[in-house]
Amino acid sequence: MTHLQAGLSPETLEKARLELNENPDTLHQDIQEVRDMVITRPDIGFLRTDDAFILRFLRARKFHHFEAFRLLAQYFEYRQQNLDMFKSFKATDPGIKQALKDGFPGGLANLDHYGRKILVLFAANWDQSRYTLVDILRAILLSLEAMIEDPELQVNGFVLIIDWSNFTFKQASKLTPNMLRLAIEGLQDSFPARFGGIHFVNQPWYIHALYTVIRPFLKEKTRKRIFLHGNNLNSLHQLIHPEILPSEFGGMLPPYDMGTWARTLLDHEYDDDSEYNVDSYNMPVKDVDKELSPKSMKRSQSVVDPTALKRMDKSEEENMQPLLALD
């Protein structure tokens, strides 16, 4: 075992070996193989390439060197293309702070039987008058940044439960294609986390319809790990034991305290702001809240490519419309 594996239990070390192809004898060589690929993408500002950081991406891609590098590149490219999201990227930012306090996201105290961290979202808690959907996404990404520092979670991963109870049609109408694409690319394509399951509970018909629309844009692996339980909490309990769930999910624990995870981040004053800023990338900043621009989010193109700054055509303008139109 190398110092890079020091935070892992014997059980997790064995899991990393069997499931992720992690080999302590070649660990430094594996990391260097990924680091050597950085020069192939001069259009991206790789702000971190230290051993511990690259190891997260290797674990997320089961030590396939090229796939790990591609994820590393997409991680920084996403931040480079959406710089405004990562300005004031800290728990004390007003929008992030309020989203955290409303439970975006929450984190249960107990791990599941696979050692995974259970994240929870209560969708109806979103107060549109105080913070935006982008703030919610920023709060989730900041939380994941803090959690992924735990090497146990790098190996074991996460599960997510979203409770859609009382989430209104009006709230759902704010979920535009570009907002959803921003979330999908930020979480599915650009972050070194292993998601073992995403569970929808109490979802109304319009959320089911929304999922049908975005499903083709999800990776096959992601689609297989999304479970639509509706009001059937028994099917949820077959996958996540009720002994570790709060009462909102039919569990045996008291109701979830929405501010638990927010207090954790705020008490530690978690701040990732210094990593991703305008000066580091030295590139134009885009106002994500203002435009959620359809000319962004094209993973294969560099933000410094002037051809990206083109006029929207009609099809792109249509993409700015809500998926669920209000009468």
Curated annotation (Swiss-Prot):
PANTHER family reported for this sequence:
ALPHA-TOCOPHEROL TRANSFER PROTEIN-RELATED (PTHR10174), CLAVESIN-2 (PTHR10174:SF73)
User: Which BP terms in the Gene Ontology apply to this protein?
Assistant: lysosome organization
Gene Ontology CC entries for this record:
clathrin-coated vesicle; early endosome membrane; endosome; trans-Golgi network
**Limits of the CRAL-TRIO domain:** 96-257
**Pfam families cross-referenced by the UniProt entry:** CRAL_TRIO (PF00650), CRAL_TRIO_N (PF03765)
This chain's protein is named Clavesin-2
Spell out the subcellular localization from the entry.
Answer: Golgi apparatus, trans-Golgi network membrane; Early endosome membrane; Cytoplasmic vesicle, Clathrin-coated vesicle
Instruction: State the domain notes.
Output: The CRAL-TRIO domain is required for targeting to the membrane and for binding PtdIns(3,5)P2.
Q: Which organism is it from?
A: Mus musculus (Mouse)
> What does the record give as the function of this protein?
Required for normal morphology of late endosomes and/or lysosomes in neurons. Binds phosphatidylinositol 3,5-bisphosphate (PtdIns(3,5)P2).
KW Chaperone (keyword) present? no
Anything else known? Binding to PtdIns(3,5)P2 is not required for localization.
Keywords attached to this entry? Cytoplasmic vesicle, Endosome, Golgi apparatus, Lipid-binding, Membrane
Coarse class of the protein's main subcellular location? Golgi
Do you know which InterPro entries this protein is assigned to?
A: CRAL-TRIO_dom (IPR001251), CRAL-TRIO_dom_sf (IPR036865), CRAL/TRIO_N_dom (IPR011074), CRAL/TRIO_N_dom_sf (IPR036273)
**Topology of the protein relative to the lipid bilayer:** Peripheral membrane protein
Q: Where is this region: Disordered?
A: 289-327
Query: In the record, what terms sit under GO molecular function?
Result: phosphatidylinositol-3,5-bisphosphate binding
- Assembly and partners? Forms a complex with clathrin heavy chain and gamma-adaptin.
